Regions:
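Long, ordered, helix-rich scaffold segments
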Residues: 1-170
Length: 170
């Protein structure tokens, strides 16, 4: 699938769907499918995320789905958010705050009372603010007031900026 051959993509999708495929192979194929970012891969991974019972596998699927820019990813995560265990919620917060549109959906869900403000980590709020979008900033201010990073956190963030930019390119 790295070459983008349609036959290879179809075979990878078939293997991920097959319950007899080993967990390790399924994990590797999920990663490859997310790298290709095809519509078929998105539909498969979203479907599996919505139906998966295993928490570890759901986190793998959320991580894979993060590579897609499609708004349906944020919508699917928010739909399951209330029923997620803590570890999944933390992963979901990281992912939802990583993209501007998903951040806006997430903070609107908080504003609507669907998600408790107290459950959102400060790092998540700061990540949402980093998008510098007025609608997000207004809701952050409404629910958390003025948040600022510590000097140490700013230093870590500035050191990580080149790596973050590189990750966004992939």
């Amino acid at each position: 699938t790295r070459l983008g051959l349609p036959e290879a993509m179809a075979e990878a999708i078939g293997l991920v769907k097959n319950t007899k495929t080993s967990a390790d192979e399924r994990r590797a194929l999920t990663k490859l499918l997310s790298e290709r970012r095809s519509t078929d891969a998105l539909e498969l991974l979203l479907g599996q995320f919505e139906e998966e019972k295993n928490s570890g596998r759901r986190i793998e699927l959320m991580t894979a789905l993060q590579r897609f820019k499609n708004n349906s990813v944020g919508t699917a995560m928010l739909a399951r958010y209330a029923g997620m265990p803590q570890r999944e919620r933390e992963s979901a917060q990281n992912i939802l705050s990583s993209r501007e549109n998903w951040s806006l959906e997430f903070i609107r869900a908080i504003d609507a009372g669907k998600i408790k403000r107290e459950d959102v980590r400060p790092a998540t709020v700061l990540a949402m603010q980093s998008h510098k979008r007025k609608a997000i900033d207004a809701l952050v201010k409404k629910h958390w007031g003025q948040l600022r990073q510590s000097t140490k956190a700013k230093q870590r963030h500035s050191q990580a900026k080149p790596w973050i930019a590189l990750a966004k390119l992939s």
